[in-house]
Amino acid sequence: MLCNLIHNIHKEGYIIIMISFLLSCIGFAISCSLGIIFLVASLLCIYFFRDPIRIVPEGDHLIISPADGIILNIEQVNSPIDNSTQVLCISIFLNVLNVHVNRIPVSGTIKATEYIPGRFISASLNKSSELNERQRIVIESNVSHHTIIVDQIAGLIARRIVCNAYEGQNVNSGERFGIIRFGSRVNIYLPLNIHISAFKGQTVIGGETILAYLEDYPHKQLTAKFI
C-alpha cells in the first residue's frame, strides 16, 4: 500500500513532503497542536502532488487535455510563435485542488522548447498568458504534421514550472512531461482546421478528456491505455 502511495506521488513533491513530515515530528515534540498543524500540511502536500493513473484514449488523431482544470476560454488568436498565423487557443485554469501534473496532448515529435521569464499575476486573468512566466513546448503531430503548442503558465502562487520534454523527443499522447506547483494555467494552441469537441466552462481531466480531433474522427474507433 505504501509503495502504491509513493508511486502515485509526483517526484517533485518528495522533498517537500519529507520536510513537512519532519516538521510535524518536531512540532509534536514541542506541542500536540503544532504537530497537528504540520501533519495537516503534510497531508495537503501529498494531495497536491498526487499523480493518478489515467485512462488515455489512443489515437494519433486525438488532442487530449494537457491538464486538469476548467476551460476559461476558447478563442482565435495569433500564434505565439508566428504572428502572421491564426490559431485556436484553449485556456485551462488549474486551482490548488487540481492535479498539477501536465501531459502530452498529441502523439508526435517535440520540435522546440522555450522558457519565457515573466510576472506572477493571477493565472485566472487572460493577460497572464502574455505576462507571466511560462514554459513552452512545440509539438509536430504524427497525423498531418500539425503544429501544436503548449504553454505551462505560472500563477500568483505557482513559482515553479517543471518541464521534462526536450527537442527531438518522440512523445505519445497522455504521457507526463511536467508539473506546475500550485495554482496555474495551461494554454494549448491548435490549428483552425480541426474538429473541436471542448467548450468554455467545461471541466477537463488531463490525459483523458478529448479536446479536439485532427481528422475524420467519426470513422475511427477509440481504444484506451492506462498511464
From Swiss-Prot:
Reactions it catalyzes: a 1,2-diacyl-sn-glycero-3-phospho-L-serine + H(+) = a 1,2-diacyl-sn-glycero-3-phosphoethanolamine + CO2
The name this protein goes by in its record: Phosphatidylserine decarboxylase proenzyme
Keywords carried by this UniProt record: Cell membrane, Decarboxylase, Lipid biosynthesis, Lipid metabolism, Lyase, Membrane, Phospholipid biosynthesis, Phospholipid metabolism, Pyruvate, Zymogen
Gene of this entry: psd
Mode of membrane association: Peripheral membrane protein
Major location (coarse): membrane
Molecular-function GO terms, alphabetical: phosphatidylserine decarboxylase activity
Metabolic or biological pathway, per its Swiss-Prot or TrEMBL entry: Phospholipid metabolism; phosphatidylethanolamine biosynthesis; phosphatidylethanolamine from CDP-diacylglycerol: step 2/2
GO annotation (BP), single: phosphatidylethanolamine biosynthetic process
PANTHER family recorded: ARCHAETIDYLSERINE DECARBOXYLASE PROENZYME-RELATED
